[in-house]
Design a protein with these regions (language model features):
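Short, solvent-exposed loop/turn at the beta-strand->alpha-helix junction
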Residues: 1, 15-20, 42-50
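Short, conserved loop/helix-junction motifs that constitute active-site signature segments
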Residues: 26-30, 145, 174-178
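Membrane-proximal C-terminal cap and juxtamembrane stalk of leucine-rich repeat ectodomains
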Residues: 34-74
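Extended, non-catalytic interaction/assembly segments in eukaryotic proteins
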Residues: 69-73, 77, 83, 87-116, ...
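Leucine-rich repeat
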Residues: 1, 17-26, 56-62, 136-139
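Inter-repeat linker/turn residues at the boundaries of leucine-rich repeats
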Residues: 4, 15, 28-31
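Conserved hydrophobic beta-strand positions in leucine-rich repeat
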Residues: 6-12, 34-39
């Protein structure tokens, strides 16, 4: 009798309950129950759904019980420093899965700018991240829970260089994706296989020590009282020793592909990817089919047929729409759910949509911009939009000069000097005029049929830039382009402000998440006017 009066049930970290047992309890839970905490259990309910509350969890299990299909997509993110061979690795994996002949590898100058996307064997949605530090803050757009992360190092680099890279990348994942599933990959082993094996062994030892230290710090008594299970759950889950590969000799490529396959379906000692090749509610897959059909520009009748069949016809399709408004999706989904007689159970079409979208985002199929009310049907377009702002080549004088000349030739600026001045101010001070943004986005705006205001608002929503103030209110600050050192007036402004509250202290840390200070600057800009700013600080009045 007392159990029926419970308002909160906490089974976090209880691995003894199967997903079926949890589902049975949820579907028969007493009316008094208000909160059910399921973190780090065998529950198949996505974390994003759990965060929506008990009603969403119950809806998930009701839909799963009503009708289920097998999930076929897994997001894989390849990250690491620049020039370590990430793009070559993705190319060799693609060739391995298709059985095609090995093609020439990308040249050293053919580096990834921002993010590149590809799909391997029809199910692995690959995100290949550019490795230059200026890109790391942009990558947070694409870091989501439920993905597999390949952290890549170059085994011809020194052990110190490799450990610095691992510390950086694992730190980013710790901050952005608690509990990320990580596979360590070493490349370029063909240069000296014995040396590569020795370096990989040293890096394995370092990684074990790093995890032990992070766990020790996280659960240090008297600091913030975090439970040991919570601390362990937040750290990257590194899967075994580093895999040694060579994209030139192809050594280790097949072993890497097999390891990825084994991890993707692993059930013991725990399932790492709760939904890949597992049953999910059919109705959520139907939402995904609707979005896929919208991406390909299907007619209303074709969309209804696709939703009813729970698949888009296997004809070759070109992407017609990159993103759509949430309102349009809601209207179409409500119509499709009615016309196709979708089994909604006790939920409304809108409630089902709210639960389905985060699941689809976790698969890598879509990206959500909730403030703007936009769903990105083709996340690659957003990567293309970010790329001109993040382009590391603008720091090279010859590339900046060539770009300025191109802008004059295309009549985007009245003359070369004005274009060069705008580019220089962007690279050196992080300030982008509207004219410069329209110029560097010209191809993006045309290719994706998006207007300047929409793209501007999207990047501001994700704190990738924010409006300047004062007499430059039409310009924008791009935080990741801000200079590392404070301007000359910074010290004087700090000293002259008698009303300022000043706190001086030391923080002992070996890692600050990329983009953290820039995001703080973006979040605070509406509180006043920046008198001056740089990458790690500023004066706001």
């Amino acid at each position: 009798m007392r159990l029926s009066l419970l308002k909160t049930v906490d089974v976090r970290y209880c691995k003894g309950f199967s997903d079926d047992a949890i589902a049975s309890y949820v579907l028969q839970a007493p009316a008094a129950l208000e909160t059910l905490k399921l973190e780090n259990t065998n529950a198949s309910v996505p974390e994003a759904t759990q965060e929506q509350g008990l009603a969403a969890v119950r809806q998930y299990y009701e839909q799963l019980q009503a009708d289920a299909v097998i999930s076929e997509h897994l997001k894989v993110v390849v990250t690491g420093n620049g020039r370590v061979g990430k793009t070559s690795l993705v190319q060799r994996l693609q060739e391995h899965y298709t059985g095609s002949t090995a093609k020439p590898l990308p040249s050293a100058d053919d580096r990834t700018i921002g993010v590149e996307m590809a799909t391997l064997k029809g199910s692995l949605v690959m995100y290949d991240f550019g490795g230059q530090p200026e890109y790391w803050a942009w990558h947070k757009l694409f870091l989501t829970a439920g993905a597999m992360y390949l952290v890549v190092v170059d085994l011809t680099d020194s052990t110190e260089t490799c450990t610095d890279a691992l510390r950086e990348q694992l730190g980013i994942l710790s901050c952005s994706v608690p509990g990320a599933v990580v596979l360590l990959v070493g490349t370029k082993a063909d240069a000296d296989i014995a040396d590569a094996q020795q370096r990989a062994s040293e890096l394995n030892s370092w990684t074990g020590n790093w995890l032990a230290e992070r766990r020790k710090v996280a659960v240090k008594p008297g600091v913030h009282g975090q439970r040991e299970q919570d601390a362990a759950a937040e750290l990257p889950r590194i899967q075994g020793d580093m895999l040694i590969t060579s994209s030139r000799s192809l050594d280790g490529i097949a072993a890497l592909a097999k390891r990825m396959e084994d991890l993707s379906v692993q059930a013991e000692p725990e399932r790492l990817f709760l939904h890949y090749r597992q049953p999910i509610p059919k109705v959520y897959q139907q939402v995904g089919v609707l979005l896929q059909g919208m991406k390909y520009g299907l007619s209303t009748s074709e969309l209804l047929e696709a939703v009813a069949q729970c698949k888009v016809a296997e004809d070759e399709h070109d992407v017609q729409r990159q993103f759509v408004s949430m309102k349009e999706i809601e209207t179409l989904w409500e119509s499709a759910a009615t016309e196709a007689q979708v089994a909604l159970k006790n939920a409304s079409a809108r409630e089902v949509l709210q639960v389905a979208l985060p699941i689809l985002e976790g698969e890598g199929s879509v990206l959500l911009s909730p403030v703007s009310g936009i769903v990105h049907l083709n996340p690659a377009w957003l990567a293309d939009a970010v790329r001109p702002l993040a382009d590391h080549r603008l720091h090279q004088m010859t590339h900046m000069e060539d770009t300025a000349q191109s802008m004059e030739d295309r009549e985007l600026f009245p003359d070369y000097n004005l274009a060069h001045r705008a580019l220089r101010e962007f690279v050196q001070r992080g300030i982008a005029s509207r004219q410069l943004l329209e110029a560097i986005w010209l191809d993006v705006l045309k290719t994706y049929s998006v207007d300047y205001a929409t793209l501007n608002d999207l990047l501001c929503e994700h704190k990738l830039m924010f409006p300047a103030a004062g007499d430059r209110s039409s310009d924008f600050i791009v935080p990741v382009k801000l200079p590392k050192l404070p301007p000359e007036e910074f010290a004087a402004l700090c000293a002259s402000s008698s009303e300022a509250a000043v706190v001086v202290g030391k923080v002992r840390t070996r890692f600050i998440p990329p983009g953290l200070m820039q995001m703080v600057a973006a979040a605070l800009h509406h509180l006043g006017q920046y008198r001056c700013y740089f990458r790690y600080g500023g004066v706001l009045e």
